Design a protein with these regions (language model features):
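Acidic/polar alpha-helix N-cap and adjacent early helical turns
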Residues: 96-105
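AMP-binding/adenylate-forming catalytic core of the ANL superfamily
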Residues: 1-70, 79-96
Length: 105
C-alpha cells in the first residue's frame, strides 16, 4: 500500500494493468518520495525482448484501465528486476534506489 496525497493506492492493482500492456514482460510498482504528495506511484518496467516501450504509451494504457490518480507518475525502464533466490521481486531495493536518487531538502 502506498499513500499519495492522502489516497490509498494498491501497487498490485497498477501492476496488473501494466502487465496487460503490449510489450511489458515484468513490472513492479512502488511509492517514490515526493515533497508535495508524500509518495507518488513509480513503475519499474522490463520490456519484452525486442520491444520498445514509452512512458506515453504506458500512460495511455493506464488511463484506459484505471483511475487517473492511480497511474504511475514516473516509469523507470530496467533490464531486470532485483529478485531473491525464490524469484520474489525485492521492492525494498527499488525503494532504496528511488530514495538515493531523490534530492535531499
Amino acid at each position: 500500500l502506498l499513500i499519495s496525497g492522502g489516497t490509498n493506492i494498491y501497487p498490485r492493482e497498477v501492476e496488473e494493468v501494466l502487465l496487460t500492456a503490449p510489450g511489458v514482460a515484468e513490472v513492479s510498482v512502488v511509492g517514490g518520495p515526493d515533497p508535495e504528495w508524500g509518495e507518488v506511484v513509480v513503475a519499474f518496467v522490463v520490456a519484452q525482448a525486442g520491444q520498445a516501450l514509452s512512458p506515453e504509451g504506458l500512460d495511455a494504457h493506464c488511463v484506459e484501465h484505471i483511475a487517473r490518480f492511480k497511474r504511475p507518475k514516473r516509469y523507470v525502464f530496467v533490464d531486470q528486476l532485483p529478485k531473491n533466490n525464490y524469484g520474489k521481486v525485492l521492492k525494498t531495493e527499488l525503494r532504496e534506489r528511488l530514495h538515493a536518487e531523490s534530492p535531499r531538502p
